[in-house]
């Protein structure tokens, strides 16, 4: 590594072709003492160069850029550096587009309409090896997944198979944890869940942690998908 960086902090590289957006993201990340933005660039070529130079923990990657776009750059980086964590930043919330991007090996997908809390939370989750999907995107993915499940059930019924009977909600979750899980499915962020249930964001995080532990999953996206698959929550 050619540059001096603070190894006790989460080192971040920002790649986006709009300088004003990069500067705005820098200001948000600067509010978090655990973060250090070590470099930024304007296209996919810069991304490869900066990763080689700084060996960051997390790369914030735009998609629509000149020269080498974010999808190509992410695929190239993951192939060269399998341990690198790429958090994609995009304006697109279409589930087919998101799925295409995630197939490159990206660790997360965040819409550019995100607030500061969501950005900070996403970087922390991805840096720790988890996956983070923007709540709005998660909701769209879940609706598409649910549609496909319903189609499969209908096809099975038509050829004489019994419809799969969903298991009852998890008895190991408390009432409050079930409420939090439902709101997670609805696409709520931790802050929004806290406002809806009149509890602090810290309490919400504790509930989410307990849910993940009890369900034996790594992140909230897995928890939501598993819950829908088993009929523990409603897709609204």
UniProtKB/Swiss-Prot annotation:
Q: Which cysteines are joined by disulfide bonds?
A: none
Protein name as it appears in the record = Transcriptional regulatory protein DegU
Domain of life (superkingdom)? Bacteria
PTM notes: Phosphorylated and dephosphorylated by DegS.
User: Cellular component GO terms, alphabetically?
Assistant: cytoplasm
> What gene name is listed for this protein?
degU
Instruction: Tell me which positions the record assigns to the signal sequence.
Output: none
Instruction: Name the Gene Ontology biological process terms.
Output: phosphorelay signal transduction system; regulation of DNA-templated transcription
Question: What functional role does this protein have?
Answer: Member of the two-component regulatory system DegS/DegU, which plays an important role in the transition growth phase.
Which PROSITE patterns would you find in this protein's record?
HTH_LUXR_1, HTH_LUXR_2, RESPONSE_REGULATORY
- Stretches assigned to the HTH luxR-type domain: 166-231
Main location (coarse class): cytoplasm
Localization, per the record, is: Cytoplasm
**Native organism:** Brevibacillus brevis (Bacillus brevis)
